[in-house]
């Protein structure tokens, strides 16, 4: 979104290109890990047809990722269309989680997978907020519908976060980690930036798109750290 919002040939566009290249590098590393993990799982276990269909759909989407990136680089695809295709790919992964939950008969395992699913939704909504907010700030156009969309994404994140909290017993280590996630420096900084953004046009003009992007990215990385802790706990439950 930031890339599309920047004027080609400007310093902002060059910075957006560098940021995009770094994002892609990180994404490629995660895709490689995903392929290794899913191939290992499929070699050792069988899945019901709905899960297998989800795996195949995501594989096809990842196979088409390079062509989508080329279309973005050449600006031959509209920003909205590219966002839709990226979102569809990501949600293919997120929506697989309920399919897995459906087959679980262990109450504790089900709760933790539900918590992971809720945090995956938080991370997805946070990613959208990152892109839309940075693009809006970069554009300099105070747009109320876009602001309402950002506010809605913030509300959805809070709802899913509360769902994740509800999956853990009071005092549990993972519940405490989740609660701390609400009070990180990145979370506090983002909340301040949200309030500034929503205050008035002058508030929006006081923000920098790069700072919004960095702050939201730091918060997402913190969320992903908590998700990783849940995965490790899930692995322990499955092994025992």
Where are these regions (language model features)?
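Hydrophobic alpha-helical segments
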Residues: 1-240
């Amino acid at each position: 979104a930031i890339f599309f919002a920047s004027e080609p040939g400007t310093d902002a566009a060059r910075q957006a290109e560098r940021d995009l290249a770094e994002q892609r590098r990180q994404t490629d590393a995660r895709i490689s890990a995903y392929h290794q993990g899913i191939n290992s799982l499929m070699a050792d276990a069988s899945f019901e047809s709905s899960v297998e269909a989800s795996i195949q759909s995501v594989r096809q989407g990842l196979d088409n990722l390079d062509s989508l990136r080329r279309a973005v680089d050449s600006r031959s695809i509209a920003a909205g269309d590219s966002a839709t295709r990226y979102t569809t790919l990501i949600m293919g992964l997120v929506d697989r989680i309920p399919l897995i939950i459906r087959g679980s008969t262990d109450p504790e395992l089900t709760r933790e997978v539900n918590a992971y699913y809720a945090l995956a939704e938080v991370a997805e909504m946070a990613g959208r907020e990152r892109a839309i907010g940075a693009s809006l700030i970069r554009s300099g156009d105070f747009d109320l519908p876009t602001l309402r969309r950002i506010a809605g994404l913030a509300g959805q994140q809070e709802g899913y976060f509360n769902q994740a909290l509800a999956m853990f017993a009071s005092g549990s280590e993972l519940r405490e980690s989740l609660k701390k996630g609400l009070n990180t420096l990145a979370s506090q900084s983002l909340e301040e930036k949200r309030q500034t953004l929503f205050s008035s046009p002058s508030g929006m003009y006081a923000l920098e798109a790069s700072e919004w992007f960095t702050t939201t990215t730091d918060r997402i990385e913190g969320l992903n750290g908590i998700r990783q802790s849940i995965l490790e706990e899930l692995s322990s439950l499955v092994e025992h």
